[in-house]
Amino acid sequence: MESKALLLVALSVWLQSLIVSREGLATADRISGGRDFTDIESKFALRTPEDTVEDTCHLIPGVTESVANCHFNHSSKTFVVIHGWTVTGMYESWVPKLVAALYKREPDSNVIVVDWLSRAQQHYPISAGYTKLVGQDVATFIDWMAVEFSYPPNNVHLLGYSLGAHAAGIAGSLTKKKVNRITGLDPAGPNFEYAEAPSRLSPDDADFVDVLHTFTRGSPGRSIGIQKPVGHVDIYPNGGTFQPGCNIGEAIRVIAERGLGDVDQLVKCSHERSIHLFIDSLLNEENPSKAYRCNSKEAFEKGLCLSCRKNRCNNLGYEINKVRAKRSSKMYLKTRAQMPYKVFHYQVKMRFSGTESDTHTNQAFEISLYGTVAESENIPFTLPEVSTNKTYSFLIYTEVDIGELLMLKLKWVSDSYFSWSNWWSSPGFAIEKIRVKAGETQKKVIFCSREKKSHLQKGKSSVVFVKCHDKSLNRKSG
C-alpha cells in the first residue's frame, strides 16, 4: 500500500512537471526578440475566400511560424475587421458578409478578423473600457508584423464597427508607424461622445480616417452612434439619425412591450446599416453613392449643398477620395432602403408668384421627372411654408437613373381633411420657371411652363414644365 501511494505521488509530480514544462514552452514561443506577447488576449484569425465564416487559422504574435502556416500574403494589403459590443458572445452575421465582399474586391488581400468576444460580451461600460486593451493588442500585432516580417503598416486598413471603431482608433494611435486607413462604421456614442481624442477614434489615428454615421438619433452621449465628426471625412447617410427600411414605430412598440431586453436587436438595423453601405461600395464599384459636404442636414434637405467644386462631394465607402482637410468634412446623402443603396439627388428651385399676398404652411406636393432613360413619378415632398413672391429650394431624389432631364410635372396635393374654403375655391400660385440641378452629373436645367406662366392650384391637375427654349437661360445655368 505504501509503495502504491509513493508511486501515485511520483506520477502526480511527473504530470505537474510535464504541464509546467509545456506551459513554459508555449510561453517561450510567444516571447520574441525580448518582447513578451502572452498578455495579448485578442485573437487574429486570417480568414480565406473559401471560408469566410470560421476562424480556422490564427496569426499569433510572437509565433513566427503561425504567419506561414496561415499563408499570409506579404506582398498584398491587409484588412483588419474589429467587431463591436455583443450580447450573445458570438460573431454577428455581418462579419462573414464583409469578409466575402473584401475578398471579392481585393482577391489577393489578407482579411483578418479580430476576436475580442469575451471582452465585448460584458456590460456595455465594461466592454467600452476594454477598447483600450483591444487597441493595444491590435497595435502590438501590427508592430510585430512590421518588425518581424518588414510588413509595412501603410498596407493596413482597419475597419471597426461600433465599439470596434474606437478600438481601431486607439490601435492606430499606438502603432510606431501610422496605418494607411481606418474606416469607422457608426462608432459607438455612449462613453465616447465627450471623450478626448486618445480614448476614441480621431483623424490623427491613421493617414486617412473616414466615418459613416447611421444611428445618431437621440441626445449627444445617449445616441447609439457617435454624433460628432471624428474623421477626416464624416458621412451622415439620411442625416445619420435613422435609416430607410428600419421601422422606428415597430422598435418603439417592442421596447414598450418587452422592455430593453431586446434593444440589441432593435438597434441593429440602423446601426448595422453602416456596414452594409460599405459592403455595397465594395460590390457595386461601378456606381458609388455620392455624398455632399454641407454645414447641416437642414441645409442639405433644402438642396443647397449639391456641389462638387473643391472636393465638396465624395464617394461613400471603399472608393472614397482621401481628402485631408484641417477640419472634419461633414457630408450628407440619401439612400434606398435596400442594396444597392445609391440614389440620384436633385435640387429644385421655384418661385411662387401672385398678385395677392398669400401664405400656407406645411404644404404637400408631388413632382414627376421624365428623362431620356426612365421616369420617376409622384415623388412626394413638403414645404414648411409657401408664400407669394418667394423662391423656395428643396431636395428630391430618385431610386433610378432617369438620364438627361426632359420634362417635369408638379402637383399641389389637397389636404386629407375636408375644408370649406378649399371646396368653394382652391388657392393657387403662378410659376414661371423651375430650376433643377442634378447632383450626380452636376448639370443644371431650367424648365418653363408651356404658357408664359403656369397656374398651380391646390388639389387640381398637375402642371407640365418643359425645357426652356431660350438658350441664354440654360447657358447661365451651366
From Swiss-Prot:
It is a peripheral membrane protein. It comes from the Eukaryota. Residues 344-467 form the PLAT domain. The modification 3'-nitrotyrosine is found at residues 124, 194, 346. Residues 35-56, 446-470 are annotated as: Interaction with GPIHBP1. Coiled coil: none annotated. One of its GO terms (biological process) is fatty acid biosynthetic process. Residues 433-437 are annotated as: Important for heparin binding. Its EC number is 3.1.1.34, 3.1.1.32. Belongs to the AB hydrolase superfamily. Lipase family. Key enzyme in triglyceride metabolism. Catalyzes the hydrolysis of triglycerides from circulating chylomicrons and very low density lipoproteins (VLDL), and thereby plays an important role in lipid clearance from the blood stream, lipid utilization and storage. Although it has both phospholipase and triglyceride lipase activities it is primarily a triglyceride lipase with low but detectable phospholipase activity. Mediates margination of triglyceride-rich lipoprotein particles in capillaries. This is Lipoprotein lipase. It comes from Sus scrofa. The lineage of its organism: Eukaryota, Metazoa, Chordata, Craniata, Vertebrata.
